[in-house]
Amino acid sequence: MEKSHFFAHLARMNLIQRWPLMRSVSTENISEHSLQVAFVAHALALIKNKKFDGNTNPERIALLGMFHDTSEVLTGDMPTPIKYYNPAIAEEYKKIELAAEQKLLSMLPEEFQEDYAPLLDSHCINKDDYVIVKQADSLCAYLKCLEELNAGNHEFAQAKKRLEKTLQTRSTPEMEYFLNTFVESFNLTLDEIS
């Protein structure tokens, strides 16, 4: 039986720090971030289905959220201002991400690669599901900015402004519902939400 290093790599998600160029009050790794994205993506899918006549699979979308940054165990987390500095860099980095996805997929025993491809390979992911995960990813980054700003860390002020624009461009009724229903609580203290 051939040995697989797939899950040993995934276990290293907790070693990949997000926001590597930012001074953070509370550090965040991609494992923590991916779980939060899964929670939020699941909620967005439920909201879409229950409030806006959607027909999504919330559990599948939650899984996509869990796996959405797994390629970063091979690439690290590239800061957004660098990743999208210009179209050429963005295009080249996308190629690196795709290669990392394929490398991760190849680490699995062959009989499971087909099962994991729709979670790991961005070419195989349903585009409508991907949109929801990207919305959740942006929302979670925005929530991180709120957390840092509320802790007095102004390092995240520009990131918050940038993410507000991103949220506007990715806006959907379910995202607006989430923002209006859940986000204000992130500005409150533990006593205020208890």
Swiss-Prot record:
HAMAP family (UniProt xref): 5DNU
Name of the protein in question: 5'-deoxynucleotidase PBPRA2627
Residues reported in the UniProt entry to bind substrate: R18, W19, H33, D69, D77, M78, P79, T80, D137
Catalytic activity: a 2'-deoxyribonucleoside 5'-phosphate + H2O = a 2'-deoxyribonucleoside + phosphate
Organism: Photobacterium profundum (strain SS9)
GO molecular function: 5'-deoxynucleotidase activity; metal ion binding; nucleotide binding
Family named by the database record: Belongs to the 5DNU family.
EC number, UniProt record: 3.1.3.89
Residues of the HD domain: 30-142
GO cellular component: cytoplasm
Cofactor entry: a divalent metal cation
Role description: Catalyzes the strictly specific dephosphorylation of 2'-deoxyribonucleoside 5'-monophosphates.
Protein localization: Cytoplasm
Entry annotated with the keyword Glycoprotein: no
Annotated positions binding a divalent metal cation: H33, H68, D69, D137
One Pfam family recorded for the sequence: YfbR-like
Enzyme class: hydrolase
Residues annotated as site: Appears to be important in orienting the phosphate for catalysis: R18
NCBIfam families: PRK03826.1
Record key words, sorted: Cytoplasm, Hydrolase, Metal-binding, Nucleotide-binding
Subunit record text: Homodimer.
